Structures are given as structure tokens and as C-alpha cells.
């Protein structure tokens, strides 16, 4: 992008666990916290080139990968108890945040983490 003189947006998919910690998720949380720091630093490094860098931090999203976990009542109840809006995310929720960050509507947004978490990190 720099060599071509292209201004734009880099969007990294992180996790709500990049904002908070999670029991029995030490390595996962560490990797997502690293992504948050990396993205903030890259936002500063690339700003002079007109390149914005942000992250999208979703909560649990209903996918083929998460369906088996959500089938376990105890796990699902725990997850839902942490989400004030009362439901897990959908892939469209994440896609909408990415679309916003990729568009000119976010031309003043860089170094930010867009939390698509139903309020998990507000608790």
C-alpha cells in the first residue's frame, strides 16, 4: 500500500479476549492482546501514509466451529450470562463492523478496537 501510494484500511480480526482476560484461555488471550498492541502501533506507523489500522473484537459468534460448544447447556448458559444483549453474535454482525471500517464512514477511525460483543466487555 505504501509503495503504491494507496490509502486505505487494514482490519485485523481479534476477539473480546483481546480486551479482557479469560479463565483457561491464557495463550488465546495473550495472542489477542498482542494483536491489539500490534494494531495500535501499526496505526501510528502508517497514519502518515493515510493507512488506518483497526481491530474487530467479536464475542462468541455462531459458526460451525462454535456450535458444538453452544450445544453444551452449562457453557451456553455461562456465555449468555456474560452478554447483556442476551444472544451470541452472528457472522453478519462481524461483517458489518468490517464493512464500516473498510468504508469512508470510518475515515477518522484508526488504532481502535470495535467491540462486537453484546456488552461482554462492559461488565
Can you say where each PLM-predicted feature lies in the sequence?
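Alpha-helical segment proximal to the catalytic Tyr-Lys
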Residues: 3, 44-48, 107
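Active-site helix of classical SDR
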Residues: 6, 31, 39
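Active-site loop immediately N-terminal to the catalytic Tyr-X3-Lys motif
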Residues: 7, 20-26, 48, 86, ...
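Residue(s) in the substrate-gating loop at a strand-loop-helix junction
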Residues: 15
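Hydrophobic alpha-helix immediately C-terminal to the catalytic Tyr-X-X-X-Lys motif of short-chain
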Residues: 34, 38-42, 46, 56, ...
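Short, flexible catalytic-loop segment of classical short-chain dehydrogenase/reductase
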Residues: 36, 57-68
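C-terminal substrate-recognition "lid" of short-chain dehydrogenase/reductases
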Residues: 52, 87-116, 121
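Catalytic Tyr-x(3-8)-Lys segment
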Residues: 73-93
